[in-house]
Amino acid sequence: MKRRISFLSRLLDTFFPRACAVCGERLSMSEEILCGACNLRLPRTGYVHSPYDNELVRLFWGLIPIEKGASLFFYKPHSDTSRLIYKLKYGHHPEIGEALGRLIADEFNVEQYFDGITAIVPVPLTKQRLRERGYNQSMEIARGISAVTGIPILEKALQRVTFHGSQTQKDHWQRNENVEKAFRLTDSSSIAGQHILLIDDIITSGATLVSAAQELLKGENVKL
């Protein structure tokens, strides 16, 4: 989706040039967060082309009922993707999340991925974690998707009540234990009858999403 470049944006870019979040090279006025080379190099999953049966969706089979699922990039430690996510989560760059959300929306819209989805729920952080970081990276991604698609965000529907550290260094069983009963449904009326897009920044075993989804599915006639 093309976006207008204002005179103010051009002026700011002259004095405060923007850099690619991965390689650090200067961005052109038409580029956002990623330079063209890094955008092409980041490994896309292609799951959006088969959203009903892919490696991601299979993580949830037998655990929760899920209509479809997709992710934009593969994630590996010490990769370009991991550097991008690290800056988003720990580098105080919430704008990366919103830009990634817009990128996801633009690319997924080509496949009509969002057809029928009526609400977006980002995986929440605990209040303490939110205070420490200053923002929820999943919420920022959700904002970007919402800005392009017009799908509303239900920020208060789900609350995170426990957090026992990052999932990335844990094994499968530790991940499941780490997020067991980690969430609480706080506004069941707002999600009744909704087809929800559940957003997280990184998916490893899928344990976090399963825990969050189990709470959301307590709502009446909810689909994910």
What are the language-model segments listed below?
Residues 1-224:
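Glycine-rich phosphate/pyrophosphate-handling loop used in enzymes and phosphotransfer proteins
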